[in-house]
Amino acid sequence: MGHISAAEAIKEEIISYNKNDKVYIVDVIDFLFPSFSKTIYSGFNNLTSKFASLYNLLNKTAGNHNNSVPLKKVLVKKVDDLLDRYETDFIISTIPIASKYISMYKETKKSNIPLYTYITDITAHNEWLGKETDMYFVGSKETKDELIQKGVEEDKIQICGIPVRQAFKNNNAVEQKHKKEILIMGGGLGLIPGIEDILYRLNKNENINLTLICGKNRELYQKIKTKFPSVNVVGYTNKVHEYMMRSDLIITKSGGITTFEAIHTSCPLYIIEPFLMQEVGNARFIEKNNIGKIKWSKKSDLADEVIELIKDEHELNKMKENMDRIREEINNDYLLSVLSA
């Protein structure tokens, strides 16, 4: 899950400053609704995969700084217990529901505990906003401008990129390769539309090596492993950074965290048909900064476009240079400066 991955990256960052700091990662859904957390996550996955238009509509119509939540008294008590248990000095949120609930808690209890929100996509929909949020950490100037338009004070916004684990930042040189390496990723469930046709057509090119990361999708893993023996098929792995570093191109969805993992490993992106509001925002950022190519329409031919791009060394190098520029623009001391204030 993206918000947990972001939280783990932030924890690594904090501990790299001071190994004695105690950082606790709490899945807010599991903590607040332990009996229903699996159902909530399953429902969310169904909503985004099967009813994406409804999901986009809900995000667009969410009210700015709306701190009203159901079961308010119960949730305030639970947050009280949580903060007491961990002797909390400050809270960092990587998911909208946590930002909303903690903001509501602060307003209700008149609490001064600092609340910092990391927005893990380029598009900042209204559910991220809370009246009592002390600082927003965002991925780009586009996100900052969007928050200002929504009424957030400029001095409460820090551009710092979207958090990724330290392993993605240790960009070591890769040995010379004889073939182009293409990495295909479809998130935790490994879902890429038309994956078999993509593999069939790309696999026929003798100058390309293919790696497919299936995540926890065992059915897809077995199916592709059997049907395409020359493709390097990988299940769930914590070494995604290694696969990215040795790849020349990543075919994937436009997740915010994945985008910045690619930026830190200098690996150009080929994005497949973004549709969710946050995916579209991330894709526009990728296109505007020329760090990848976007397949906006089902009509365009993915395999032909990928083969054309992978052969264009000049274009790939321009994309890598643009990724280098984005990395240089990020404020790497953002967190230390805030926490030590």
Predicted regions and their residues:
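Acidic donor-binding loop of glycosyltransferase active sites
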Residues: 245-255
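C-terminal alpha-helical cap of glycosyltransferases
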Residues: 328-341
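Donor-nucleotide binding loops and adjacent catalytic segments primarily
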Residues: 177-246
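Nucleotide-sugar donor-binding and catalytic loop/hinge architecture
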Residues: 154, 167-184
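Conserved N-terminal ligand/cofactor-binding loop architecture of enzyme catalytic domains
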Residues: 9-86
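C-terminal "capping" alpha-helix adjacent to the active site of nucleotide-linked donor transferases
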Residues: 288-290, 298-314
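Active-site-proximal region of nucleotide-activated glycan assembly enzymes
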Residues: 107-159, 164-167
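A short, well-ordered alpha-helix in the C-terminal region of glycosyltransferases
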Residues: 308, 315-329
